[in-house]
Amino acid sequence: MKVKGMRWWVLGLIVLVTIINYLDRNTLGIMWAKIVEDLGLINTEGLSEAEFNDLSKKLFRDINMVFMVAYGLSQMFSGKIYDKIGTRRGFTISALVWGISDLLTSLTTGVKGIASARAGLGLGVAGPWPGAVKSNAEWFPQKERAMAQGFFNAGASIGAILAPILIAVIYAAVGWKWTFVAIGVLAPLWVIPWLIVNKKGPKEHPWITDKERDYIISGQPECNVKSDKGLSWGQLLSKRKSYAVILGRFFLDPIWWMFVTWLPIYLGQKYGMDIKQLASHIWIPYVGAALGSLAGGWMSGFFMRKGKSVGFSRKAAILIGASILLPSLVFVAFVQDPMVAVSVMAIILFGYQFTINNIQTLPGDMYTGKSIGSLAGLGGAAATLGTILSMLFIPMLTAGDNWTPFFIMGASLVPLSLICVFLFGGKIEHDALVENNTKQ
């Protein structure tokens, strides 16, 4: 049996599991207020509403810090693991770990149980990020990789769009405990079609047509086709251009996590939204994110089709996205109307995904073979570290329900990321010589 467009079937399954990934991530934040109430996580005696909100934010931050530490460690090691065992087994392990962890949250009765379940979730949900970069480098010619990465990132945004709606509907029907079960079971179920479809890589897959196989391989750098051994972390860290990814993501990724983690809390505390009201508002910013993912991938591909170099194409797209992101973050800091706020946030996340999509593609542009997942993992670990450090300040910055400093902090991170990408990136091309030397 031969299947036309096999690479798109593989990518489609990765997009699907990314949607599921973001459903699992968002369960806690959307239902947080009700979980705090039902489990009595905060003693409300003698507390004003503002004091209760501050304590709730601190507790939510602490639990998410546990999640982020696990997520960061997983990002760092998942890249190496995916490089070693391949994307087929790598995605399988990740999906099983995070799905079971989210499902087990339904059994928790206190802060320690919730934190433990979120740690397991963090270990699992991190894997697809270095895994997708590696899979796209294997399955797509270079000119299509940013678009493939755009579809992957759009999956995260679609998951974030669907999460408040699905979670609110399931919660209204069966309560928060069974909502964790219903969402948690999806990732293990996804493993079944994944193992059936993704049998081998494009060079050996029995279903791929000869035409598509030749198209993929001929569109990849020659060193990528021949390379079979990757660089060590030490070798990657010794090269200046690696820091375009590592530091670029260290500064930029916290902006995404500010919204993913804190947007439900922000809308709930500033505008008094309950779960149903959140469901009708919180999806709007992620529509912008999904469109930005696709537009950012298309833009760099457009430049390459016009004959521009890979380096010019990626950097131009990064600069365009950042020019949308930065002023929008400053503007939203002073908005008071909830509909205006979420609409501007759609522009913010459009610019963010436009930018990060091209930064995330850089490992496949700079290195080859079994180095791609490793650098993507190091970049993800740095991104998590930056997010953890920024989260430490958020309860302090938003004390008294003043969220303006929250957005100003996000705006300050954009130029720092740009400086790192342009300062360290240099000429973006594959480091074939170093990788080939590792074989000798």
Name these PLM-found stretches:
Residues R61-K80, W283-G296:
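Central cavity-lining transmembrane alpha-helices of secondary-active solute carriers
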Residues G155-H205:
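Helix-loop-helix hairpin linking two adjacent transmembrane segments in secondary transporters
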Residues M31-L73:
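Extracellular/periplasmic helix-loop-helix junction of adjacent transmembrane segments
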Residues L28-I30, L237-L294, T355-Q360, S390-M391:
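Extracytoplasmic gate region of multi-pass secondary transporters
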